[in-house]
Regions:
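Long hydrophobic alpha-helical segments typical of transmembrane helices together
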Residues: 167-196
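Short alpha-helical hairpin
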Residues: 1-16, 35, 157-168
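Acidic interhelical loop/turn segments
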Residues: 133-140, 163-173
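Surface-exposed helix-capping loop/turn segments at secondary-structure junctions
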Residues: 41, 45, 49, 79, ...
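Active-site-proximal alpha-helical scaffolds that flank and shape metal-associated catalytic sites
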Residues: 26, 50-153, 180, 184
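A generic alpha-helix surface/boundary motif
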Residues: 6, 36-37, 68, 94
């Protein structure tokens, strides 16, 4: 459903309204905060050194590339620091944050991986659409951050880790519940910019 969402179509077409993109990015910046906490928790709780190092590498990428995009996009969209830091969170953003922070506080690597596979896998799905990129930086760069060999390798790493860790678990009920909640929230997140 997300791959054909109105938000994705308009982003690729370059026709998404600035207000819609602005509202989405402001909320996504708060998602980004909790997302970084999940990656940090994975560095702490992954069961193999190689895995810890891969998460550390991704944290460096996010600091340089993704946060850089947010700062440039906010400037272009004329969003002040106060506007994106001191904002009322949308109920979907709040619910997503709570789900992510509950994974962090669980200290459970498998629960963290479920959240990451959903978040990143869904974005790879729509980011990899075989369509021409829009001209504007604020549109094309958000797509570029979620496609290409580096991002695809990252998502495959997450899937492989979840498969590896999940094989040793007897009861997958809680993981399945978390998975279902995360999928529903990811889909609802695309509607944020259109709600106002």
């Amino acid at each position: 459903a997300a791959i054909n969402h109105r938000f994705v179509q308009e982003l690729f077409d370059g026709t998404i309204e600035n207000k819609v993109l602005k509202d989405y990015l402001i909320q996504d910046y708060h998602f980004f905060d909790a997302f970084l906490s999940m990656l940090g928790a994975c560095v702490a709780h992954a069961d193999q050194l190689e895995s810890k190092l891969r998460f550390a590498k991704q944290l460096g990428f996010l600091e340089a590339d993704e946060d850089g995009y947010f700062q440039k996009a906010f400037k272009e969209l004329k969003v002040s620091e106060n506007d994106y830091l001191e904002v009322t969170l949308h109920p979907v953003t709040k619910a997503f944050q709570e789900l992510m922070y509950s994974a962090v506080s669980s200290s459970d690597y498998a629960h963290l991986l479920v959240m990451l596979v959903i978040a990143e896998g869904l974005y790879l799905d729509w980011g990899s659409k075989d369509l021409a990129l829009p001209e504007a930086y604020i549109h094309s760069e958000w797509i570029n951050l979620h496609r290409g060999p580096f991002f695809a390798e990252w998502v495959q790493f997450l899937v492989d880790e979840l498969n590896r860790v999940g094989k040793g678990l007897e009861d997958l009920t809680e993981l399945q519940e978390r998975w279902n909640q995360a999928v529903a929230l990811e889909l609802a997140f695309f509607d944020i910019g259109y709600d106002a």
